[in-house]
């Protein structure tokens, strides 16, 4: 996959373009030896990338969370799990493609995996509704969670949505009810629930599959009640203030960890998750295995008590 660069990465992009040009020159003429120059530029590019990503602000992280090349739920399922068997439909209205889920194995152990799914091509984005689920998507997710509970399987969710779909049809079919029901039912599931924000964690649309015993965030993901643009439009009447809004919203992983709203921050490869899908998946898999090891000794009663105490601890100052 061709690397796409954001505007604050342009100096890095220029160096990478020079490296590719030198490699092409070597490929076209075997007599040319540019290994030393290529190595020098690679080292310079790596140092510049480290410097750039060591001090990203909240708005830059927000844009990283939305990066079009960022790995999505199905990318992680392919790399972390085996024997994935997708399950479809809410058994009431339709199969919402913005939510994917099914039974899989994590290191041989049966688990239920559920997550938001965006699209890359225009056709796929339309099919997945840009990762914005309708009520039937959340009802499908709940159906799979309840199935997991019946068969005593841990539940693993991947969160990556700008928010629940706000269309008229979704509201007519009970969008708010579907989200509220998921919040209630997830809080009482008698199996371990591990939630990870892998990109955008947008409002109730994210929270509807985000109530768990462990909540993780990828290093450059975000979690908030509204987008920076939406917040800026309300407070300053202009989306151009999005960068200011992002700073005051506290939507980054370090800030949410500081507030004890999440448990762990999963490190991303240098330059972001989209730079190395396999490395990112390996980091996330390790985190999931460690979380399961922490939760396995707890029986259903202990899980529910722990989850209740967690939820009651939210919102303090």
Swiss-Prot record:
InterPro entries: Acetyl_CoA_COase_a_su (IPR001095), ClpP/crotonase-like_dom_sf (IPR029045), COA_CT_C (IPR011763). GO terms for molecular function: acetyl-CoA carboxylase activity; ATP binding; carboxyl- or carbamoyltransferase activity. It comes from the Bacteria. It catalyses: N(6)-carboxybiotinyl-L-lysyl-[protein] + acetyl-CoA = N(6)-biotinyl-L-lysyl-[protein] + malonyl-CoA. Keywords: ATP-binding, Cytoplasm, Fatty acid biosynthesis, Fatty acid metabolism, Lipid biosynthesis, Lipid metabolism, Nucleotide-binding, Transferase. Pathway: Lipid metabolism; malonyl-CoA biosynthesis; malonyl-CoA from acetyl-CoA: step 1/1. Its EC number is 2.1.3.15. One of its GO terms (cellular component) is acetyl-CoA carboxylase complex. GO terms for biological process: fatty acid biosynthetic process; malonyl-CoA biosynthetic process. Residues 33-294 form the CoA carboxyltransferase C-terminal domain. The keyword Cell division does not apply. PROSITE patterns: COA_CT_CTER. It is found in: Cytoplasm. Pfam families: ACCA. It is an enzyme of class 2 (transferase). Component of the acetyl coenzyme A carboxylase (ACC) complex. First, biotin carboxylase catalyzes the carboxylation of biotin on its carrier protein (BCCP) and then the CO(2) group is transferred by the carboxyltransferase to acetyl-CoA to form malonyl-CoA. Belongs to the AccA family. Acetyl-CoA carboxylase is a heterohexamer composed of biotin carboxyl carrier protein (AccB), biotin carboxylase (AccC) and two subunits each of ACCase subunit alpha (AccA) and ACCase subunit beta (AccD). HAMAP family: AcetylCoA_CT_alpha. This is Acetyl-coenzyme A carboxylase carboxyl transferase subunit alpha. The gene is accA.
């Amino acid at each position: 996959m061709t690397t796409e660069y954001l505007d604050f990465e342009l100096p890095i992009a220029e160096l990478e373009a020079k490296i590719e040009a030198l490699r092409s020159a070597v490929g076209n003429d075997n007599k040319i030896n540019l290994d030393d120059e290529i190595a020098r530029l690679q080292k310079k590019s790596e140092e510049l990338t480290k410097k750039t990503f060591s001090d990203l602000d909240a708005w830059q992280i927000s844009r990283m969370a939305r990066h079009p090349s960022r790995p999505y739920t199905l990318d992680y399922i392919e790399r972390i799990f085996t024997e994935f068997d997708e399950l479809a439909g809410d058994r009431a209205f339709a199969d919402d493609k913005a939510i994917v889920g099914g039974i899989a194995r994590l290191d041989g152990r049966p688990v239920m995996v559920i997550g938001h799914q965006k699209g890359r091509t225009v056709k796929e984005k339309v099919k997945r509704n840009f990762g914005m689920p309708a009520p039937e998507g959340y009802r499908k997710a709940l159906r799979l969670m309840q199935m997991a509970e019946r068969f005593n399987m841990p539940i693993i969710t991947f969160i990556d949505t700008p928010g629940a779909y706000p269309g008229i049809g979704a509201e007519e079919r009970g969008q708010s009810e579907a989200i509220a029901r998921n919040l209630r039912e997830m809080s009482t599931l008698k199996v371990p629930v591990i939630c990870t924000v892998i990109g955008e964690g947008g409002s109730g649309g994210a929270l509807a599959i985000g109530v768990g015993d462990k909540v993780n965030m990828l290093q450059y993901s975000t979690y908030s009640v509204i987008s920076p643009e939406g917040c800026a439009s309300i407070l300053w009447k202009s989306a151009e203030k999005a960068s200011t809004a992002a700073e005051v919203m506290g939507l980054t992983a370090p800030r949410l960890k500081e507030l004890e709203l999440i448990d762990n921050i999963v490190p991303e490869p240098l330059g972001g998750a989209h730079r190395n899908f396999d490395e990112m998946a390996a980091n996330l898999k390790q985190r999931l295995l460690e979380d399961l090891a922490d939760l396995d000794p707890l029986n259903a009663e202990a899980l529910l008590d722990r989850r209740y105490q967690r939820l009651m601890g939210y919102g303090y100052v």
